[in-house]
Amino acid sequence: MNRAPLKRSRILRMALTGVSAVSEESESGNKPFLLRALQIALVVSLYWVTSISMVFLNKYLLDSPSLQLDTPIFVTFYQCLVTSLLCKGLSTLATCCPGMVDFPTLNLDLKVARSVLPLSVVFIGMITFNNLCLKYVGVPFYNVGRSLTTVFNVLLSYLLLKQTTSFYALLTCGVIIGGFWLGIDQEGAEGTLSLTGTIFGVLASLCVSLNAIYTKKVLPAVDHSIWRLTFYNNVNACVLFLPLMIVLGELRALLAFTHLSSAHFWLMMTLGGLFGFAIGYVTGLQIKFTSPLTHNVSGTAKACAQTVLAVLYYEEIKSFLWWTSNLMVLGGSSAYTWVRGWEMQKTQEDPSSKDGEKSAIRV
């Protein structure tokens, strides 16, 4: 039951460093505890800083009163363009200087691009709905607005993969759903609820779950390389975003934008693209130095810190029930991670328990 997470972790490790999982484990075992603890602390801190900074920067680009830029598709397109160029640049550098950079060779193959296209459509939905959610809701409510990813993971795993879920895991999903609805109720009571942003958040959560499922199916087409998949996804996204920008009139809005020639604007846009590229790298690093399970726990703790920082930064006052909704979402997500980890460990230690699970209450 724990084979899939280990496999994804190994893929990420090999994609990032080119070193096998066995050699990495032996190397980490030889390192002093203090050094390993310091490495983990630095990597987790890097993940937190990158992820939180990206959210606040995207909020500035998408909904800043000083910018007044109403082109969310263009912002997303530009971030995909920066990521594509960075991937190609690192690939070229790795080819020219093999000892300096370890990065797979990237050559655009139209046949591979077509194979990745279905996943790219889901990827486009994921990043577009994510940015649209952030545009219409405040950063403090952002995590609650996108909190249904775990619930969709359970639902789609059953509908598409025919994988059942234990009763205790379903209970944690119930807590998440309860926190989500309480958060909507409290945002409405405070007069800050954006129904449009909430719908985009739900759609973003759905696309995140679909992206995780279909990534497994598409990885063989790119030789199980996370970086190749990132490159093709972003190239396909750039191509598909162009007609969307034309149809939605964003090109006209961009030409009329007063800060179009501002160096500060393009610096912020490019920085957003760099953060978009970096988040994939630091996510892989965090899984490499910890585990997929620890990565999920770290992500939940990061979301909690991000919410507190957002409330302080925007100087908002929230009710007790509003904070309760956040705690329910974060607590339910943490509990789900713990339950799934416990179930995987139990199955690994006692394979016969898998048969006993069938008698438990299922989805």
Curated annotation (Swiss-Prot):
Topology in the lipid bilayer is annotated as: Multi-pass membrane protein
Keyword annotations from UniProtKB, A to Z: Golgi apparatus, Membrane, Sugar transport, Transmembrane, Transmembrane helix, Transport
Give a GO biological-process term: negative regulation of Notch signaling pathway
Q: Which reaction does it catalyse?
A: GMP(out) + GDP-beta-L-fucose(in) = GMP(in) + GDP-beta-L-fucose(out)
Against InterPro entries, the record matches this protein to:
Sugar_P_trans_dom (IPR004853), TPT_transporter (IPR050186)
Q: Report whether Transport shows up as a keyword of the record.
A: yes
The terms under GO molecular function for this entry are: GDP-fucose transmembrane transporter activity
Q: Which GO terms describe its cellular component?
A: Golgi membrane
Where in the cell is the protein located?
A: Golgi apparatus membrane
Q: Which residues cross the membrane?
A: 33-55, 75-97, 110-129, 139-161, 166-184, 194-213, 226-248, 263-285
**Protein family per UniProt:** Belongs to the TPT transporter family. SLC35C subfamily.
Briefly, what is this protein's role?
Antiporter specific for GDP-l-fucose and depending on the concomitant reverse transport of GMP. Involved in GDP-fucose import from the cytoplasm into the Golgi lumen.
- Name the UniProt record assigns to this protein: GDP-fucose transporter 1
